């Protein structure tokens, strides 16, 4: 992981808050299948390193059981809370969202999160289930426990159902997004309703899906700009105003190819 040479750009959400467009994830790659109380020291060290190098957007979730590690890394970093942007998600305790956020905050040892997401819509058997859950999310925001609220893995039909009764439009929808999974109709829906997009798995085309159709194009760009395929993948997201969340430990921006250079 390389030092950030220029500040990471921020995207203004529909509620007026801003989100850093590059986030460090503590998700699937770090999922704990065992006891949540057993601290993964490697993850703590990884998050600390990310923070030290300027990656202040930290993305977690209750289901990954890594909120304690995130808390420990934040505390050890010594970085002021107001400089950090912390996201967590609810799904395990979706039936009681207002208690779920309190549990997450206790594990994170924080008074609030910057962004709270419903992790997936698949708990819902009816539109009413989606609407009830979103009403609870709105209550969480009203209580001050989350500055912004949003969803993850929602498709247009889930968003449509939610918006029918929503008082607050979701600030963001975090989805799997990379060159092989671009979701044109969903992104169009987001744009129509002022919902920002965040991408998880943005490096999939150059990691999990390689070799593939974009390989030659990536190699040409790597040679042209003297940067890595990972940097190109992240820049591709940011150039589309899509927040990129990655668990990669490799370097991202360089002097020649940085987050603020839109040429």
Task: Label the predicted regions.
Residues 81-94, 115-121, 177:
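A short, structured active-site edge motif that brings together acidic residues
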Residues 8, 47, 67, 71-74, ...:
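Generic structural signal for well-ordered alpha-helices
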Residues 120-263:
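Beta/alpha (TIM)-barrel catalytic core signal, keyed to glycine-rich beta->alpha loops juxtaposed to Asp/Glu
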Residues 1-83, 136, 204:
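N-terminal binding-site loop/beta-alpha segment at the start of enzyme catalytic domains
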Residues 21, 81-84, 111-115, 147-148, ...:
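Short acidic capping loops at alpha-helix termini that bridge into adjacent secondary structure
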Residues 98-118, 139-143:
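CE4/NodB-like, metal-dependent polysaccharide N-deacetylase domain
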Residues 31-33, 59-69, 91-97, 123-127, ...:
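Acidic-and-aromatic substrate-binding clefts and catalytic sites of carbohydrate-active enzymes
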Residues 33-51, 94-109, 130, 157-160, ...:
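Short, acidic/polar
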């Amino acid at each position: 992981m390389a030092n950030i040479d220029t500040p990471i750009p921020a995207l203004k959400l529909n509620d007026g808050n801003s989100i850093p467009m590059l986030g460090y994830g503590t998700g699937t790659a770090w999922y704990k299948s065992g006891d949540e109380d057993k601290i993964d020291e490697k993850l703590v060290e990884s998050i600390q390193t990310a923070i030290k190098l300027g990656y202040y957007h930290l993305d977690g979730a209750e289901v990954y059981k890594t909120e304690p590690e995130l808390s420990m890394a934040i505390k050890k970093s010594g970085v002021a809370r107001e400089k950090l942007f912390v996201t967590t998600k609810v799904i395990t305790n979706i039936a009681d969202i207002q208690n779920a956020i309190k549990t997450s905050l206790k594990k994170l040892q924080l008074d609030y999160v910057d962004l709270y997401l419903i992790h997936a819509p698949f708990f819902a058997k009816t539109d009413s289930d989606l609407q009830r859950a979103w009403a609870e999310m709105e209550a969480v925001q009203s209580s001050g426990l989350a500055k912004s609220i949003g969803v993850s893995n929602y498709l247009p039909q889930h968003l449509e159902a939610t918006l029918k009764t929503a008082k607050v439009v979701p600030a963001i929808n975090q989805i799997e997004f990379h060159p092989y999974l671009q979701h044109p109709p969903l992104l169009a829906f987001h744009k129509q309703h002022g919902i920002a997009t965040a991408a998880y798995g943005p490096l999939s085309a150059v990691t999990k899906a390689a070799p593939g159709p974009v390989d030659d194009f990536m190699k040409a760009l790597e040679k042209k700009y003297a940067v890595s395929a990972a940097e190109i993948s992240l820049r591709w997201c940011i150039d589309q105003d899509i927040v990129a969340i990655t668990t990669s430990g490799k370097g991202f921006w360089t002097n020649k190819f940085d987050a603020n250079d839109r040429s």
